[in-house]
């Protein structure tokens, strides 16, 4: 219907001129004659080959070899017969096109008829006085319309017949190769000389070399060792994996080729693979693994081990720094019983000891008190001596009576003596430890050659009872009979709570030299 409307759009003069001025039916008739001659040639060759096969099977060549030869030639014989029939059909279709052209040429209004119609119409219009030619003019115009419709219908009919004839001509197929069933290597070579992909040919040659000719791949025929890819159904064999790899390679090559030429067909091809081809091979693999579970365990063990390693590394991201270990507090070091200098710190009372010779008489044993464990170290200068029994009335007269602590009861004399002996032993241990450390300490040597100048206000002088003799400033005499101080000595206050306010010093010291200040 569409073609008829297209032909109707043009006047009949155009169709008549094109149809009658073209090359005519000559070329189409020549093509029909050529197809007919080719069909007769194919028929003759097929007849000759059939006679030869019959003679081979019936003559002296009869036997398995003759039967194998006949079986190898039968596909080619069938192709010859089919090609002869196809050529005859093509010739017949072209002859039908020639007949349609002849019919269209006969039915088409000629250019002379169309010119006569136009001439008649012009004359009647020119002589149409007072409308006397109105009816003849209308008849002439109706005849022109008839020729218009006839030309369009003729062209539409000719087009339909020609298209149908051309479409019905069978396509030519390439002839099959005459091969025996065990001649796959020659088959592969002939394929290489054909239109196979060069990459596929290279892979086929590599497979053949690596396997020593045991794997023959024909990319064009889609076979491995003469069998199609789908003939290999056992994943437990190496040939199944080779066939699947080669099949996937060709499938993706075909998909890429179609993607550039016909994208719709390419995606249809991919859908067919996903729905029908790949599930079949996956089912074969799943069935084989179900029948051999030990292989599945062996295949999954490395993967599971890898996942365990990854999870172990992931645990490193959650490491929290451990809080610093707080060292346990060391036990309180035993501080030797050394009394501070008067005025440097507030000392506590120490156990009473026997007064040195020549010193003032000490208080009764009941007035002595024990010292605290944490006694500040004494400053340099005079030996630490304090006199007096603590603040008197005039020192802290405003202190409430309730805030004063009651004096402890008198200790046993034996306990006081034991405490004094323990303090002496402890002092000796401290001195021995200090002496050892002096021999092994790492210190920088001070290379000052000048005499050390004591700080201002400090006097580094004392009396020594051992070693090379007395040390200290001039005028100091050593008295071997002076006993070593044993602690804080407190003198008793009088009835007005006014005790001595000066420390008790050794009687051998020359106070006059000290008072001179040099």
From Swiss-Prot:
Domain of life: Bacteria
A biological process term (GO) from this entry: response to host immune response
GO CC annotation: extracellular region
Major localisation: secreted
Region (Disordered): 177-197, 346-375
PANTHER family noted in UniProt: GLUTAMINE-RICH PROTEIN 2
Similarity comment: Belongs to the mycobacterial PPE family.
Name assigned to this protein: PPE family protein PPE11
Organism this protein belongs to: Mycobacterium tuberculosis (strain CDC 1551 / Oshkosh)
């Amino acid at each position: 219907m569409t073609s008829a409307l297209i032909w109707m759009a043009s006047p009949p003069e155009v169709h008549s001129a094109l149809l009658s001025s073209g090359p005519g039916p000559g070329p189409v008739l020549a093509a029909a004659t050529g197809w007919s001659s080719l069909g007769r040639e194919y028929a003759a060759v097929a007849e000759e080959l059939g006679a030869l096969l019959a003679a081979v099977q019936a003559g002296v060549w009869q036997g398995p070899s003759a039967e194998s030869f006949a079986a190898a030639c039968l596909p080619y014989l069938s192709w010859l017969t089919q090609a002869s029939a196809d050529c005859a059909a093509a010739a017949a279709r072209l002859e039908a096109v020639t007949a349609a052209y002849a019919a269209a040429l006969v039915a088409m209004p000629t250019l002379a008829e169309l010119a006569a119609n136009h001439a008649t119409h012009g004359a009647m219009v020119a002589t149409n006085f007072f409308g006397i030619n109105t009816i003849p003019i209308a008849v002439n115009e109706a005849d022109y319309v008839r020729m218009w419709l006839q030309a369009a219908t003729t062209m539409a009919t000719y087009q339909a017949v020609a298209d149908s004839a051309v479409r019905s001509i069978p396509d030519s197929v390439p002839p099959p190769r005459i091969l025996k069933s065990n001649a796959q290597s020659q088959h592969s070579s002939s394929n290489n000389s054909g239109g196979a992909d060069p990459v596929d040919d290279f892979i086929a040659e590599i497979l053949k070399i690596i396997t020593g000719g045991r794997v023959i791949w024909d990319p064009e025929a889609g076979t491995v060792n003469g069998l199609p890819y789908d003939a290999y159904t056992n994943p437990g064999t190496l040939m199944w994996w080779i066939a699947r790899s080669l099949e996937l390679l060709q499938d993706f090559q075909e998909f890429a080729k179609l993607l550039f030429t016909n994208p719709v067909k390419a995606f249809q091809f991919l859908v067919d693979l996903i729905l029908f081809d790949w599930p079949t091979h996956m089912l074969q693999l799943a069935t084989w693994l179900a029948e051999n579970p030990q292989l599945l365990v062996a295949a999954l063990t490395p993967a599971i081990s890898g996942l365990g390693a990854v999870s172990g590394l992931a645990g490193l991201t959650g490491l929290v720094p451990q809080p610093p270990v707080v060292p346990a507090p060391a036990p309180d070091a035993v501080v030797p019983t050394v009394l501070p200098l008067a005025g440097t710190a507030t000392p506590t009372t120490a156990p009473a000891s026997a007064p040195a010779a020549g010193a003032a008489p000490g208080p009764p044993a009941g007035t002595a008190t024990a010292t605290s464990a944490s006694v500040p170290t004494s400053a340099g200068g005079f030996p630490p001596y304090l006199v007096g029994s603590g603040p008197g009335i005039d020192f802290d007269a405003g202190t409430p009576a309730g805030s004063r602590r009651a004096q402890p009861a008198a200790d046993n004399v034996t306990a006081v003596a034991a405490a004094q002996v323990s303090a002496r032993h402890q002092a000796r241990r401290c001195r021995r430890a200090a002496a050892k450390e002096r021999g092994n300490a790492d210190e920088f040597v001070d290379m000052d050659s000048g005499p050390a100048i004591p700080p201002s206000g400090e006097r580094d002088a004392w009396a020594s009872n051992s070693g090379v003799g007395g040390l200290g400033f001039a005028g100091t005499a050593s008295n071997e009979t002076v006993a070593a101080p044993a602690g804080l000595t407190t003198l008793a206050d009088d009835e007005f709570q006014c005790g001595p306010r000066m420390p008790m010093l050794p009687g051998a010291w020359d106070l006059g030299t000290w008072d001179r200040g040099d």
